Design a protein with these regions (language model features):
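A short, exposed loop/beta-hairpin motif centered on an aromatic-Gly-Thr core
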Residues: 48-53
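Short, well-ordered alpha-helical microsegments
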Residues: 36, 61-62
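Conserved NAD+-utilizing ADP-ribose enzyme module
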Residues: 1-24, 46-47, 62-63, 67-167
Length: 167
């Protein structure tokens, strides 16, 4: 896997913002060819809710495309590139760490489904293979938030950017 320390990823994003650059290059991996974003194809119970998910890492998007292709054994592996123009009119939520707020946010979206927030864009860590066991133990009530955060502390995770504004 092509994983970075999440703080490295966020530092990269913050540097771009600090430089006054209002654009970010994002990638989306899929096994389906498309010309328009169709959120009816989005899965319901995802980390940041129903949305269109991208990443700043092209290799991560390529891995997403490969997993989808292997899971469905249909289509091809596609990696789409987008330019995201940040705007002050967008309500953007940044998660900077695998912390209690991130855990609770993911729990609400995964358990309740749909969109459990009012943000247009959410940026933060992915609950993936490295973190899923701890996240599941927290969601089931076996671990307290503080225990889960301590276990997640040393994990390296990928990033995700979820857009809900197409809904």
């Amino acid at each position: 896997l092509h994983q970075l320390d999440f703080s490295e990823t966020l530092n990269y994003i913050e540097e771009i913002i600090a430089e006054g650059t209002s654009t970010l290059i994002l990638y989306h991996g899929s096994n389906i060819a498309f010309d328009r974003i169709d959120l009816s194809k989005s899965h319901n119970r995802r980390d940041f809710g129903r949305g269109f998910y991208c990443t700043i890492l092209e290799k991560q998007a390529s891995e997403w495309a490969h997993r989808l292709y292997m899971r469905n054994l249909s289509g091809k592996e596609y990696v789409y590139q987008y330019v995201f123009h940040q705007s002050e009119s967008l309500k953007i939520k940044h998660f900077y760490a695998l912390d209690a707020e991130w855990l609770e946010f993911i729990k609400n979206n995964r358990i309740k489904g749909g969109i459990q927030h009012s943000y247009d864009v959410v940026i933060g860590p992915v609950a993936d293979d490295n973190t899923m066991e701890t996240v599941q133990l927290y969601m089931s009530g076996i671990l307290k938030s503080s225990e889960a955060v301590e276990r997640l502390r040393y994990n390296k995770v990928n990033n995700q950017v979820s857009f809900q504004l197409f809904l």
